[in-house]
Each structure stands twice: as C-alpha cells, then as structure tokens.
C-alpha cells in the first residue's frame, strides 16, 4: 500500500520529484528507509535533510511508462516531450490494442524513428497478448520482472530498473548502469575520483534494503538546487 498526501497546488521540476506542495503518493517504506539510511551512511545523513519532504513519485500506468521510456531514448528531454505529446494524442486512448491499430506513417509523422515504431509495436504486442504478467508483478521478485521486460525490444536492464523504481516503487534496486548514480557516488564518496562498479557496490552495501531510496537522493544531490538549505555539520 501507498499513502496519499493531500495539499495545495504545486509542481515539481522533474516527474520523479515530489514535495508536499502537490497531491502525491509516498511509498510506504520511505520514512523507515530514510531513518535507516541516516543511521547507516554518513553521506545520507548529510543529504536527506537537505531535501525536506521531497520524495520519489510513482509514475502513470505500466504500458505508458514503458512506452514513454522508449520514445525518450537518445534524444533530449524537450524533444522527447514533444514527440510523446504528438504520439500519445494519436489513439483515442493510449492502450496496447489501440497502438497496434495505428498506421506506421502516422507514428513516423509524430517524430518517431522507424526503430522506435518497431519497439512500440513489440511492447504493445507483449502487453496485448499477456506475454508480460502485469497482474503478477506485485508478487514477483525484481529479477523475474526484469527478465520479462528485457525480452521486449528496446528495453534493456537500465530501463527495466527505472521501471522498478518509478512505477513499481521497489525499495532495493541498485541501477549500476546509471551514469547519474555512478557520478553521484564519485562526487559524494570519492571526491570526484573515478568509480568502478565494485566501488559502487561497496558503497551501496550500507544502503540495503533501501538502495532505490539512496539512489534517489544521490540523483537529487546532482540537481542544481536542493529543496532546503543544507544544515551545518554537527
């Protein structure tokens, strides 16, 4: 279960950042995870208070989340938003069956490459035929879900891990292929020196079983402005 925070209108800079100024869904483990990380990790003890009530925000439905990740591959954020707006407006409702009814020419006209059209069709087929077990995901472990997702064209492990974090809000995902995570670990733990996957795993050993939460704070540490001024070191 997740709890709902109701408050006044507001917005966040990124889709995955939320604060108490918006109606948001907080993963039920978030507070406990923060307590654990502050206790176990010196960097988390410094970072977490800087961002106040900001937290990970779960994203839309499974199909559109994965479709959007495909649309956004290898293009800028602005370009991805423009293409997504055009593509998602093509069907009356964005469902696997409706995407399969779209004409390739119309999808290309929305700004999609031929390869991305193929990927979106394959994604739609997997959902439409039940090749992915959406209703079973809540009871499946992370690696089993990743195995299902990477069988879809255009979805590699990193995309599957982002899906676990931002859609399924799994608490203990460590996306070692994520450039931002590695960069953040380098800056926060190694004074900017080069970091290997082994180094990252060693750092993350203290984060378990809340690697997703720690990763989220590492990402936030790379943002230009924290939500709250950093407290003085004790």
Question: Where are the language model's segments positioned?
Answer:
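Short alpha-helical scaffolding segments that buttress acidic/His motifs in well-ordered protein cores
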Residues: 66-71, 120-124, 163-164, 214-218
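Non-catalytic interaction surface on structured domains
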Residues: 50, 58, 62, 109, ...
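Alpha-helix C-capping/helix-to-loop hinge sites
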Residues: 54, 69, 73-74, 90, ...
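Alpha-helical ds-nucleic-acid-binding substructure associated with the helix-hairpin-helix region
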Residues: 24, 43, 75-76, 80-153, ...
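A positional/architectural concept
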Residues: 25, 32, 38-69, 74-85, ...
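A general alpha-helix detector
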Residues: 65-70, 102-106, 144-148, 180, ...
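C-terminal accessory module of base-excision DNA glycosylases/AP lyases that mediates lesion recognition
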Residues: 1-54, 138, 142-143, 157-234
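Structural motif
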Residues: 56-64, 111-115, 204-211
